[in-house]
Regions:
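Short capping segments at the starts of secondary-structure elements
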Residues: 77-80, 146-152
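Short, amphipathic alpha-helical interaction segments positioned at domain boundaries
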Residues: 113-140, 205-225
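Charge-enriched amphipathic alpha-helical scaffolds
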Residues: 89-97, 163-191
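Basic helix-extension-helix modules of the SAP/HeH family
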Residues: 1-68, 73-111
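Conserved small/polar residues in nucleotide/adenosyl-binding loops
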Residues: 266-270
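Accessory beta->alpha helical hairpin/"wing" motif in late/C-terminal subdomains of nucleic-acid enzymes
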Residues: 41-49, 101-124, 188-209
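Structured, charged N-terminal subsegments at the starts of enzyme catalytic cores
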Residues: 207-264
Length: 270
């Protein structure tokens, strides 16, 4: 059991305990200008300032389960829980400086709580979280069905059947922010500028992934309902499913056979 206690660190100090590469990734995702040799503290200062100015970024970055766990921890200060059950949530929340997990103790950053408590408890935020989870589940359902998808065509399908008001820019921003916490081994292509987003592994020749796609422009996808996409995603355990890297390998090996048209996502590099 892990006891929940207050951290003595400031919010900037908490953020700065993250690996430098994580701070650089987060800075890139939320549009912060930084230098390659910038220190952890300097990056943390810029991130804190950005999140204070734009707290709405937090609900776009963090999954609903992570924010619900954070609210639970705030209510349970001084009590204990089984930390192993919330490993993914703890990882996400530490990434943004809300807490750390040390020596079987969950340390809550009080400065972060003071600054973000009311915004994260609002009804509007709860609605945004539910909307984000809905969109995330649809995207994962598409991933499992098609193997690899293009973000632009993805947006068209979602607009036609599920989110008619969703714009391409909104979908791109959501994915760019949220994939920081998705499982690795996935690749996302932006058809508008041919940019590939990767997380933890690189592809020797990125173009090979899309050769068949380019040659066979007549290829198309069967359309499904929102519930079918979401049920498939949930059936595969979206958040903690270990099969995403295996799916990635399978798609890469079979792309030559025209069995799959290309997305795949990942979370560290662009």
């Amino acid at each position: 059991m892990a006891r929940i206690e207050e951290s003595k660190r400031t919010y900037i100090e908490e953020l700065a305990t993250n690996p430098r590469v994580n701070l650089m990734v987060l800075s890139e995702r939320i549009d912060i200008v930084f230098h390659e040799d910038e220190s952890e503290v300097s990056l943390a200062e810029k991130i804190a300032e950005k999140l204070y100015d734009m707290p709405q970024l937090i609900t776009k970055l963090l999954q609903q389960e992570a924010i619900e766990f954070l609210l639970q921890c705030w209510d349970m200060e001084g009590e204990s829980l089984i930390a192993e059950m919330y490993a993914r949530e703890i990882e996400q929340l530490h990434f943004l400086g809300f807490l750390s997990y040390e020596d079987d103790t969950i340390l809550l950053n009080i400065e972060a709580k003071d600054n973000f408590f009311f915004s994260l408890k609002s009804r509007r935020v709860q609605e945004e979280l539910e909307e984000g989870t809905r969109l995330e589940n649809i995207l994962f359902g598409m991933l499992f069905l098609y193997g690899i998808l293009d973000i632009y065509e993805c947006c068209q399908m979602i607009q036609e059947e599920m989110f008619p008001e969703l714009t391409y820019d909104e979908l791109e921003e959501f994915i760019l922010l949220r994939i920081v916490f998705w499982q690795s081994g996935i690749l996302l292509r932006n058809q508008m500028n041919s940019r590939l987003l990767l997380a933890s592994r690189e592809v020797e020749n990125r173009n090979e992934v899309f050769i068949q796609w380019s040659l066979r422009e007549d290829l198309s996808w069967k359309r499904y309902s929102e519930d079918e996409y979401k049920n498939l995603a949930l059936g595969n355990g979206i958040g903690g499913w270990d099969g995403i890297p295996e799916l990635y390998d399978f798609v890469m090996k079979n792309i030559e056979n025209d069995q799959y048209k290309a997305v795949s996502y990942t979370h560290l590099r662009a």
